[in-house]
């Protein structure tokens, strides 16, 4: 009986704590997915984060590196208590801290890039008590200067070719549009001419139909006059014969 009586207040406390206490939000880290560089140059590995808590003095940043074709991961940089530290390794004296935790920035710069630097870099940020979250990674690809220039030239050639294709396509469409418009205009003019011819033909037919009775009347008059003249001429001849 006593145990059941104790369980009820405990369960009630758990329920109240679940309702009153805010849920824990995971810290979110963001990086680029791919970064390119050339031998001897430098590249910035950008890393930003978002935390539901105020940025405390206990915020920490850790960068790890995993070479291509390798399963091993190395710690190359660490920031804690306001102090950056570079771990011993291939990036010793080649890493520069350019981040600012107050501005939620955890970026670093790699100097004097080499071909062996190709690999995946992981950025991990902790802001106690907000320590739950996933790291973000960025892949670095280092190329020779000649290869980079060749890639740049190839990209320019492809861009120019695409631009030419677009221009030619636009010209073809414009020519086709103008041709179709001209055809429509010509058809309209022809139809207008045909309508005018039909109208003239109708008018002429009406006029001819109106003039036909007049012509017939004129012919009848001329025929009557001719017959009268013939009649008069016949009477005169007969009188002459009688004399």
UniProtKB/Swiss-Prot annotation:
Pfam families, per the entry: Myelin-PO_C, V-set
UniProt region (Disordered), positions on chain: 201-243
Annotated coiled-coil segments of the chain: none
Basic and acidic residues bias (residue ranges): 222-243
Residues making up the signal peptide according to the UniProt record: 1-26
Topological domains, Cytoplasmic: 176-243
Start and end residues of each Ig-like V-type domain: 27-141
Subcellular localization, as worded in the UniProt entry: Cell membrane
UniProt GO cellular component terms: plasma membrane
Primary subcellular site in the record, as a coarse category: membrane
Glycosylation positions in this chain: 118
Extracellular side: 27-154
UniProt keywords, alphabetically: Cell membrane, Disulfide bond, Glycoprotein, Immunoglobulin domain, Membrane, Signal, Transmembrane, Transmembrane helix
InterPro entries per record: Ig-like_dom, Ig-like_dom_sf, Ig-like_fold, Ig_sub, Ig_V-set, Myelin_P0-rel, Myelin_P0_Ig-like, MYP0_C
Transmembrane stretches, start-end: 155-175
Disulphide connectivity of cysteines: 47-123
Family classification: Belongs to the myelin P0 protein family.
Protein name: Myelin protein P0
Species the sequence originates in: Xenopus tropicalis
Gene: mpz
